[in-house]
Amino acid sequence: MIPLQKDNQEEGVCPICQESLKEAVSTNCGHLFCRVCLTQHVEKASASGVFCCPLCRKPCSEEVLGTGYICPNHQKRVCRFCEESRLLLCVECLVSPEHMSHHELTIENALSHYKERLNRRSRKLRKDIAELQRLKAQQEKKLQALQFQVDHGNHRLEAGPESQHQTREQLGALPQQWLGQLEHMPAEAARILDISRAVTQLRSLVIDLERTAKELDTNTLKNAGDLLNRSAPQKLEVIYPQLEKGVSELLLQPPQKL
Protein backbone atom coordinates (compact mmCIF):
# COMPACT_ATOMS: atom_id res chain seq x y z
CA MET A 1 0.00 0.00 0.00
CA ILE A 2 1.26 3.50 -0.82
CA PRO A 3 2.25 5.34 2.40
CA LEU A 4 -0.32 7.87 3.50
CA GLN A 5 0.69 11.40 2.59
CA LYS A 6 0.26 13.87 5.45
CA ASP A 7 0.88 17.03 3.45
CA ASN A 8 -1.89 16.72 0.88
CA GLN A 9 -4.91 17.61 3.01
CA GLU A 10 -4.96 21.27 2.01
CA GLU A 11 -4.75 20.26 -1.66
CA GLY A 12 -7.91 18.16 -1.49
CA VAL A 13 -6.12 14.81 -1.92
CA CYS A 14 -7.28 11.65 -0.16
CA PRO A 15 -4.36 10.16 1.86
CA ILE A 16 -5.58 6.62 1.10
CA CYS A 17 -6.10 6.59 -2.68
CA GLN A 18 -3.85 9.59 -3.42
CA GLU A 19 -6.51 11.07 -5.71
CA SER A 20 -8.76 14.09 -5.46
CA LEU A 21 -11.26 13.78 -2.65
CA LYS A 22 -14.64 12.42 -3.69
CA GLU A 23 -17.56 12.98 -1.27
CA ALA A 24 -15.10 14.07 1.37
CA VAL A 25 -15.74 12.83 4.90
CA SER A 26 -13.66 13.23 8.02
CA THR A 27 -12.84 11.43 11.21
CA ASN A 28 -13.49 13.27 14.47
CA CYS A 29 -9.80 14.26 14.49
CA GLY A 30 -10.48 16.27 11.35
CA HIS A 31 -8.60 14.38 8.61
CA LEU A 32 -10.34 14.11 5.26
CA PHE A 33 -10.83 11.02 3.10
CA CYS A 34 -12.96 9.88 0.20
CA ARG A 35 -16.19 8.42 1.53
CA VAL A 36 -15.58 5.08 -0.20
CA CYS A 37 -11.96 4.88 1.01
CA LEU A 38 -12.85 5.60 4.63
CA THR A 39 -15.83 3.26 4.53
CA GLN A 40 -13.59 0.42 3.35
CA HIS A 41 -11.08 1.23 6.08
CA VAL A 42 -13.82 1.17 8.71
CA GLU A 43 -15.10 -2.18 7.46
CA LYS A 44 -11.63 -3.71 7.76
CA ALA A 45 -11.07 -2.17 11.19
CA SER A 46 -14.42 -3.43 12.46
CA ALA A 47 -13.09 -6.97 12.45
CA SER A 48 -10.53 -6.09 15.12
CA GLY A 49 -12.96 -3.91 17.05
CA VAL A 50 -10.58 -0.94 17.00
CA PHE A 51 -11.02 1.97 14.62
CA CYS A 52 -8.20 4.50 14.28
CA CYS A 53 -7.73 7.40 11.89
CA PRO A 54 -5.83 6.03 8.86
CA LEU A 55 -3.58 9.10 8.89
CA CYS A 56 -2.70 9.95 12.49
CA ARG A 57 -3.73 6.66 14.12
CA LYS A 58 -5.74 8.37 16.82
CA PRO A 59 -8.60 6.21 18.12
CA CYS A 60 -11.93 7.17 16.60
CA SER A 61 -15.52 6.10 16.86
CA GLU A 62 -17.46 5.03 13.79
CA GLU A 63 -20.49 6.89 15.13
CA VAL A 64 -18.75 10.27 15.10
CA LEU A 65 -17.73 10.29 11.45
CA GLY A 66 -18.91 13.54 9.96
CA THR A 67 -19.03 15.14 6.56
CA GLY A 68 -15.80 16.91 5.66
CA TYR A 69 -15.80 20.22 3.84
CA ILE A 70 -13.87 21.20 0.76
CA CYS A 71 -14.20 24.76 -0.51
CA PRO A 72 -16.35 24.54 -3.67
CA ASN A 73 -14.51 27.51 -5.20
CA HIS A 74 -10.89 26.47 -4.63
CA GLN A 75 -11.10 22.73 -3.85
CA LYS A 76 -9.15 23.19 -0.63
CA ARG A 77 -10.00 22.26 2.89
CA VAL A 78 -11.97 24.88 4.80
CA CYS A 79 -10.27 26.26 7.88
CA ARG A 80 -12.24 29.33 8.99
CA PHE A 81 -15.84 30.37 9.60
CA CYS A 82 -16.92 33.83 8.43
CA GLU A 83 -19.45 35.34 10.81
CA GLU A 84 -20.70 37.95 8.34
CA SER A 85 -21.42 35.60 5.45
CA ARG A 86 -21.81 32.47 7.63
CA LEU A 87 -19.65 30.51 5.23
CA LEU A 88 -16.79 28.08 5.72
CA LEU A 89 -13.64 29.45 4.09
CA CYS A 90 -10.35 28.05 2.86
CA VAL A 91 -6.99 29.87 2.88
CA GLU A 92 -7.65 31.37 -0.54
CA CYS A 93 -11.07 32.65 0.48
CA LEU A 94 -9.45 34.49 3.39
CA VAL A 95 -7.38 36.72 1.09
CA SER A 96 -10.18 37.39 -1.37
CA PRO A 97 -11.62 40.95 -1.42
CA GLU A 98 -15.03 39.57 -0.51
CA HIS A 99 -13.91 38.40 2.93
CA MET A 100 -10.82 40.46 3.77
CA SER A 101 -12.76 42.91 5.95
CA HIS A 102 -14.86 40.22 7.62
CA HIS A 103 -14.41 38.64 11.02
CA GLU A 104 -13.41 35.00 10.87
CA LEU A 105 -12.99 32.33 13.54
CA THR A 106 -11.19 29.03 13.36
CA ILE A 107 -13.75 26.28 12.99
CA GLU A 108 -12.88 24.96 16.45
CA ASN A 109 -13.37 28.39 18.04
CA ALA A 110 -16.55 28.97 16.06
CA LEU A 111 -18.02 25.71 17.33
CA SER A 112 -17.19 26.63 20.92
CA HIS A 113 -18.42 30.21 20.50
CA TYR A 114 -21.77 29.33 18.93
CA LYS A 115 -22.42 26.45 21.30
CA GLU A 116 -22.06 28.84 24.24
CA ARG A 117 -24.33 31.41 22.58
CA LEU A 118 -26.97 28.77 21.85
CA ASN A 119 -26.90 27.53 25.44
CA ARG A 120 -26.98 31.08 26.84
CA ARG A 121 -30.00 31.97 24.70
CA SER A 122 -31.73 28.77 25.78
CA ARG A 123 -31.18 29.56 29.47
CA LYS A 124 -32.55 33.09 29.00
CA LEU A 125 -35.67 31.83 27.22
CA ARG A 126 -36.30 29.25 29.94
CA LYS A 127 -36.34 32.08 32.48
CA ASP A 128 -38.74 34.03 30.26
CA ILE A 129 -41.01 30.99 30.02
CA ALA A 130 -41.04 30.61 33.80
CA GLU A 131 -41.92 34.30 34.21
CA LEU A 132 -44.68 34.09 31.62
CA GLN A 133 -46.16 31.07 33.36
CA ARG A 134 -46.05 32.91 36.68
CA LEU A 135 -47.83 35.92 35.19
CA LYS A 136 -50.39 33.71 33.48
CA ALA A 137 -51.20 31.91 36.72
CA GLN A 138 -51.42 35.23 38.55
CA GLN A 139 -53.84 36.74 36.05
CA GLU A 140 -55.98 33.59 35.90
CA LYS A 141 -56.28 33.66 39.67
CA LYS A 142 -57.34 37.30 39.64
CA LEU A 143 -59.89 36.70 36.90
CA GLN A 144 -61.33 33.81 38.88
CA ALA A 145 -61.53 36.07 41.93
CA LEU A 146 -63.40 38.71 39.94
CA GLN A 147 -65.83 36.14 38.60
CA PHE A 148 -66.40 34.91 42.14
CA GLN A 149 -67.08 38.46 43.33
CA VAL A 150 -69.60 39.01 40.54
CA ASP A 151 -71.36 35.72 41.23
CA HIS A 152 -71.37 36.44 44.95
CA GLY A 153 -72.77 39.92 44.35
CA ASN A 154 -75.60 38.55 42.23
CA HIS A 155 -76.37 35.99 44.91
CA ARG A 156 -76.58 38.66 47.61
CA LEU A 157 -78.74 40.81 45.36
CA GLU A 158 -81.21 37.98 44.98
CA ALA A 159 -81.15 37.36 48.73
CA GLY A 160 -82.18 40.95 49.47
CA PRO A 161 -80.87 43.58 51.96
CA GLU A 162 -78.95 42.21 54.90
CA SER A 163 -79.62 45.21 57.09
CA GLN A 164 -81.47 48.47 57.23
CA HIS A 165 -78.32 50.24 56.07
CA GLN A 166 -78.26 48.31 52.80
CA THR A 167 -81.26 49.30 50.72
CA ARG A 168 -82.52 47.69 47.55
CA GLU A 169 -81.55 50.85 45.69
CA GLN A 170 -77.93 50.30 46.75
CA LEU A 171 -78.07 46.66 45.77
CA GLY A 172 -79.75 47.53 42.50
CA ALA A 173 -76.74 49.56 41.47
CA LEU A 174 -74.39 46.56 41.86
CA PRO A 175 -75.16 44.69 38.60
CA GLN A 176 -74.13 47.69 36.49
CA GLN A 177 -70.90 47.92 38.48
CA TRP A 178 -70.10 44.24 37.89
CA LEU A 179 -71.15 44.38 34.25
CA GLY A 180 -68.73 47.25 33.71
CA GLN A 181 -65.90 45.13 35.05
CA LEU A 182 -67.03 42.05 33.17
CA GLU A 183 -66.78 43.93 29.88
CA HIS A 184 -63.00 43.85 30.26
CA MET A 185 -62.77 40.12 30.87
CA PRO A 186 -62.87 38.82 27.24
CA ALA A 187 -59.98 41.05 26.18
CA GLU A 188 -57.90 40.10 29.20
CA ALA A 189 -58.71 36.42 28.71
CA ALA A 190 -57.47 36.80 25.13
CA ARG A 191 -54.19 38.22 26.44
CA ILE A 192 -53.80 35.21 28.69
CA LEU A 193 -54.37 33.00 25.66
CA ASP A 194 -51.63 34.96 23.87
CA ILE A 195 -49.28 34.15 26.73
CA SER A 196 -50.10 30.45 26.41
CA ARG A 197 -49.31 30.57 22.70
CA ALA A 198 -46.09 32.48 23.35
CA VAL A 199 -44.99 29.87 25.89
CA THR A 200 -45.64 27.09 23.36
CA GLN A 201 -43.58 28.85 20.69
CA LEU A 202 -40.78 29.65 23.12
CA ARG A 203 -40.60 26.02 24.21
CA SER A 204 -40.27 24.99 20.56
CA LEU A 205 -37.45 27.50 20.09
CA VAL A 206 -35.68 26.25 23.23
CA ILE A 207 -35.86 22.67 21.93
CA ASP A 208 -34.28 23.77 18.63
CA LEU A 209 -31.56 25.74 20.43
CA GLU A 210 -30.64 22.91 22.79
CA ARG A 211 -30.68 20.28 20.04
CA THR A 212 -28.49 22.42 17.78
CA ALA A 213 -26.04 23.12 20.62
CA LYS A 214 -25.79 19.42 21.42
CA GLU A 215 -25.29 18.35 17.80
CA LEU A 216 -23.29 21.38 16.62
CA ASP A 217 -20.61 20.54 14.07
CA THR A 218 -19.46 21.83 10.70
CA ASN A 219 -22.70 20.54 9.18
CA THR A 220 -24.88 22.74 11.39
CA LEU A 221 -22.55 25.65 12.16
CA LYS A 222 -23.85 27.70 9.24
CA ASN A 223 -27.42 27.47 10.58
CA ALA A 224 -26.57 28.38 14.19
CA GLY A 225 -26.57 32.11 13.47
CA ASP A 226 -29.98 31.93 11.81
CA LEU A 227 -31.37 30.11 14.82
CA LEU A 228 -29.92 32.67 17.22
CA ASN A 229 -31.55 35.46 15.23
CA ARG A 230 -34.96 33.84 15.27
CA SER A 231 -37.23 36.22 17.14
CA ALA A 232 -39.21 35.14 20.15
CA PRO A 233 -42.97 35.32 19.43
CA GLN A 234 -43.40 38.24 21.79
CA LYS A 235 -40.96 39.86 24.19
CA LEU A 236 -41.69 39.44 27.88
CA GLU A 237 -41.36 43.18 28.47
CA VAL A 238 -44.09 43.76 25.86
CA ILE A 239 -46.57 41.24 27.25
CA TYR A 240 -46.15 42.28 30.87
CA PRO A 241 -47.13 45.98 30.43
CA GLN A 242 -50.23 44.85 28.55
CA LEU A 243 -51.27 42.77 31.51
CA GLU A 244 -50.46 45.52 33.98
CA LYS A 245 -52.44 48.08 31.99
CA GLY A 246 -55.47 45.86 31.62
CA VAL A 247 -56.31 43.14 34.10
CA SER A 248 -53.97 44.24 36.86
CA GLU A 249 -55.33 47.79 37.11
CA LEU A 250 -58.81 46.38 37.35
CA LEU A 251 -58.19 43.54 39.74
CA LEU A 252 -55.62 45.04 42.09
CA GLN A 253 -58.28 47.43 43.36
CA PRO A 254 -59.53 46.76 46.92
CA PRO A 255 -62.58 44.45 46.93
CA GLN A 256 -65.89 46.29 46.89
CA LYS A 257 -67.91 45.95 50.06
CA LEU A 258 -71.33 44.49 49.44
From Swiss-Prot:
Superkingdom, natural source: Eukaryota
Q: Please give the start and end residues of each transmembrane region.
A: none
Q: What is this protein called?
A: E3 ubiquitin ligase TRIM40
| EC class (word) | transferase
Recite the UniProt keywords alphabetically.
Answer: Coiled coil, Metal-binding, Transferase, Ubl conjugation pathway, Zinc, Zinc-finger
Which organism does this record belong to?
Homo sapiens (Human)
Q: What is its EC number?
A: 2.3.2.27
Q: Can you supply one Gene Ontology CC term for this chain's record?
A: IkappaB kinase complex
Q: Which gene encodes it?
A: TRIM40
Catalytic activity reported: S-ubiquitinyl-[E2 ubiquitin-conjugating enzyme]-L-cysteine + [acceptor protein]-L-lysine = [E2 ubiquitin-conjugating enzyme]-L-cysteine + N(6)-ubiquitinyl-[acceptor protein]-L-lysine
Query: Quaternary structure?
Result: Interacts with NEDD8.
Coiled coil regions in record: 107-159
**From which residue to which do the B box-type zinc fingers run?**
66-107
Where, by residue number, does Zn(2+) bind? 71, 74, 93, 99
Give one GO term, molecular function aspect. Answer: ubiquitin protein ligase activity
Does the entry feature the keyword Metal-binding, yes or no?
Answer: yes
Please provide the Gene Ontology terms (biological process) for this protein: innate immune response; negative regulation of cell growth; negative regulation of NF-kappaB transcription factor activity; negative regulation of non-canonical NF-kappaB signal transduction; negative regulation of protein catabolic process; negative regulation of protein localization to nucleus; protein neddylation
Zinc finger extent (RING-type):
14-56
* Keyword Transferase among UniProt keywords: yes
| CDD domains in the record | Bbox2_TRIM40_C-V, RING-HC_TRIM40-C-V
Q: Name one Pfam family in it.
A: zf-C3HC4
**Role description:** E3 ubiquitin-protein ligase that plays a role in the limitation of the innate immune response. Mediates inhibition of the RLR signaling pathway by ubiquitinating RIGI and IFIH1 receptors, leading to their proteasomal degradation. Also promotes the neddylation of IKBKG/NEMO, stabilizing NFKBIA, and thereby inhibiting of NF-kappa-B nuclear translocation and activation.
Tissues where the protein occurs: Highly expressed in normal gastrointestinal epithelia but that is down-regulated in gastrointestinal carcinomas and chronic inflammatory lesions of the gastrointestinal tract.
Q: Cross-referenced InterPro entries, in alphabetical order?
A: TRIM/RBCC (IPR050143), Znf_B-box (IPR000315), Znf_C3HC4_RING-type (IPR018957), Znf_RING (IPR001841), Znf_RING/FYVE/PHD (IPR013083), Znf_RING_CS (IPR017907)
What does the similarity note say? Belongs to the TRIM/RBCC family.
